[in-house]
């Protein structure tokens, strides 16, 4: 356990901070997990921009390992129509619900305080999704170990996504490099296309890039329609 102490003054608990116009409740005296991971700011920006640029009725997003649902707030502020937030921590989900209320975006959000691997049926029936966010802990005793459990998520991605949908894969484990994700994706979801690795915020400059936070974007190919003979098939 890590204790956090103030050197001077006082901070209200919880304290509300602002990022890109969104408000989040944080507990700055609560060890390392304050309620908002600042190094994921580019991931939230990317999702907000995806939601804003999406044509039609708006993105449908699946937010796995949602924690306090910051990704969901960003997506809904960008114009997403629906976000399903799944996390096994009832406490984190409760803070996530509060974050949505702080920003007035409750209408588009749904919350499930369940173990992800025990609730695939509900998750699948609520799909398919335009974007799937996967932001697990690298190690959480009894629930998730990246080296063996990330693969269980990857192989399900093609079935969760609409044609042309995207997956945002996050990994914050210094001992695992980008190749850990890319090699498994080539094996377990070979049809999905790697698009980019998002940069980390300047405030979190990478002294060793492969030991830093890794956030990769993959795309499910568009559905190819059969050719119309009227468009000039065989002569």
What is the meaning of each model-derived region?
Residues 68-80:
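Conserved SAM-binding loop of SAM-dependent methyltransferases across substrates and taxa
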Residues 166-235:
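C-terminal catalytic and target-recognition region of SAM-dependent MTase-like enzymes
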Residues 82-87:
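Conserved SAM-binding motif I beta-strand of class I
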Residues 136-137, 143, 170-174:
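Short strand-turn motif at the edge of the Rossmann-like AdoMet-binding core
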């Amino acid at each position: 356990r890590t204790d956090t102490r103030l050197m001077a003054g006082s901070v209200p608990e919880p304290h509300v901070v602002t990022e890109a116009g969104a408000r989040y409740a944080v507990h700055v005296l609560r060890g390392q997990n304050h309620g908002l991971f600042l190094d994921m700011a580019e991931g939230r920006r990317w999702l907000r921009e995806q939601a804003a640029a999406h044509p039609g009725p708006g993105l449908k997003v699946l937010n796995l390992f949602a924690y306090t649902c910051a990704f969901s707030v960003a997506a809904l502020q960008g114009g997403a129509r629906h976000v399903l937030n799944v996390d096994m921590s009832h406490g984190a989900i409760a803070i996530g619900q509060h974050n949505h209320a702080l920003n007035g975006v409750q209408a588009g959000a749904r919350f499930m305080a369940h173990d992800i691997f025990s609730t695939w049926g509900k998750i699948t029936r609520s799909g398919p999704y335009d974007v799937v966010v996967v932001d697990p802990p690298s190690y959480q005793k009894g629930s998730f170990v990246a080296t063996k459990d990330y693969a269980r998520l990857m192989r399900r991605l093609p079935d969760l996504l609409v044609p042309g949908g995207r997956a945002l894969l996050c990994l914050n484990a210094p001992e695992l490099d980008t190749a850990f994700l890319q090699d498994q994706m080539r094996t377990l979801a070979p049809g999905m296309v790697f698009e980019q690795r998002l940069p980390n915020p300047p405030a979190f400059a990478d002294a060793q890039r492969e030991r830093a936070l890794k956030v990769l974007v993959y795309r499910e190919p568009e559905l190819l329609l059969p050719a119309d003979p009227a468009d000039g098939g065989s002569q």
